Every structure is written in structure tokens, then in C-alpha cells.
Amino acid sequence: KCGHLNDMRLVTTEEMCAKVAAAKRARRDLRIIARTDAVQSEGLDGAIVRMNRYIEAGADIAFADALVDEHMFRTFTSRISVPFIANMAEFGRTPYYTATQFEAMGCKLVIWPASSLRIAARAMEKLYATIAKEGETRPLLDNMLTRAELYEVINYFDFESLDASVARSVVPPTADEPTWPDNT
């Protein structure tokens, strides 16, 4: 359950260590991020003890969710031996910090996991409210990517080239099916 919510139930440290060790054995070219939400239930020190066990089991990056102040970040990052990833979740327990502020607290990576979703959801609300009220989307055209811009963003022409390079299967008609001239 998300570290920003209540009523979390954690797996035991031993179970999580076993999961990290299994991921380490199975990996080829990836980094293992170990996450803990134990700060709320076990306190900062307990969460750090857990994380250090996960690191011993093979975690490459530490992630403790829902830290609530600069002291917590600085303490956590100073007591582990791997890079720390911060989670900037708007409207959560963690105060708003910039990437520079996170870096100053010892964080090597920062994620904004729901930011684009929140922005997109607000834009969709605006779109459908406009359609409901105006019956059209023209008032929002300046907020939209043009077709050319969209194709650039999604690399459309790369996919078109890939598609053209793939052989197309043709199912031959059976004896009882009519054969149609290919005039499509």
C-alpha cells in the first residue's frame, strides 16, 4: 500500500530480504530498488535498519517513501551505502522539494511518479467540460499537439517504417470460398 496512506501492512524484513536476494540472482542488466514504507510504523531508525538489511541482500538503490522533513532525508541518506531515490508525490506526506533541494539532502535520484497523470487528468476534465458546454474542441486547439507534433513525440514514422518491414501474412482461400480480384 502507498506510503502516503494509512493502515499499511509490511512484509517481514526477512521476507523482503529474500525477495531482494531472488531479484539479485535473477538479474542481468538492471538495478534493484528496495522500497520501505516502514517509517510510519517502525520509525526512522527501524526503517533504516530494514533498508540496510535489504542492501546486504543485494539492493542497489534505496527508496523510503513518505519521509516528512529534511532531517529524515539527511539522516536516511547518511546511514546507507547506496544511492537514495526520493519520491516527490504531490499532495502526499512529503513536503514539496525541488530536485536541487533533494540533491542537497543526499538524494541521488528523484521521481515524480504521478505528476504527468495529474496534469493529464486535469486536461481531460477541461476537454470534456468544454465539449459538454461548447459542443466542440476548437477553444482548446492551442492546448493540443498538432498531428505533426504528436507524430514526432510518439516517433510515429519509426513505427511506420517498422511496420513496412514486417512481412504480411495472407491466408489463401479454401476451395469453397470465392476468390476476389485484388482491387483494393
Model-based region annotation:
Residues 134-142:
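Flexible, glycine/charged-enriched surface loops at secondary-structure junctions
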Residues 147:
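Contiguous mixed-secondary-structure segments that line small-molecule binding/active-site clefts
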Residues 1-112, 118-129, 156, 162-182:
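Alpha/beta enzyme core
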